[in-house]
From Swiss-Prot:
UniProt pathway annotation: Sulfur metabolism; hydrogen sulfide biosynthesis; sulfite from sulfate: step 2/3
Keywords noted in UniProt: ATP-binding, Kinase, Nucleotide-binding, Phosphoprotein, Transferase
A Pfam family the protein falls into: APS_kinase
Organism: Cronobacter sakazakii (strain ATCC BAA-894)
Catalytic activity: adenosine 5'-phosphosulfate + ATP = 3'-phosphoadenylyl sulfate + ADP + H(+)
Function statement: Catalyzes the synthesis of activated sulfate.
Gene name, Swiss-Prot/TrEMBL: cysC
Protein name: Adenylyl-sulfate kinase
Ligand binding (ATP): G35, L36, S37, G38, S39, G40, K41, S42
Family membership: Belongs to the APS kinase family.
Top-level taxon: Bacteria
Amino acid sequence: MAQHDENVVWHAHPVTAAQREQLHGHRGVVLWFTGLSGSGKSTVAGALEEALHQLGVSTYLLDGDNVRHGLCSDLGFSDDDRKENIRRVGEVAKLMVDAGLVVLTAFISPHRAERQMVRDQLGEGRFIEVFVDTPLSVCEARDPKGLYKKARAGELRNFTGIDAVYEAPESPEIHLDGQQLVTNLMAQLLDLLRREDIIKS
């Protein structure tokens, strides 16, 4: 990775993050959904974004598959590539938070160190870790993309939960049971956002 060039300097914006938040009527923050493939991350994040949009909240959803079509299309699934994938997403999320958006991200992000890296990038009070905790057996039974079947057959290497480790969050801001109904999970998330004064009660 290229090193920082001392000739490249940060230019302050005439419009501040606080002014952007005032315009939107809410704080900028990231809800970082993490869990195994098939745990329900994207489904719950998508449902929450729709609910927040209906409440007049300015949102954007960054999905693990979608960013690999463009921003991270040059990356594979080695440990180094996974780390770079998450670093890039964290930087994009940080820009969106600075713009005053509520950003939802749905990434397996299997390593605690990478999730902590993004938390550190964003700063205090800007990162909400959402652990969608679904047993491997349930994820494998769902297998919406047929990836577990391929991994079990040896057609897919470095697949999280099969031959690559998933490090579960130790103290997420919210721990969701991925076997519950999406409506129940969404209600828990909306309650959290109200308690944190990110959206109005």
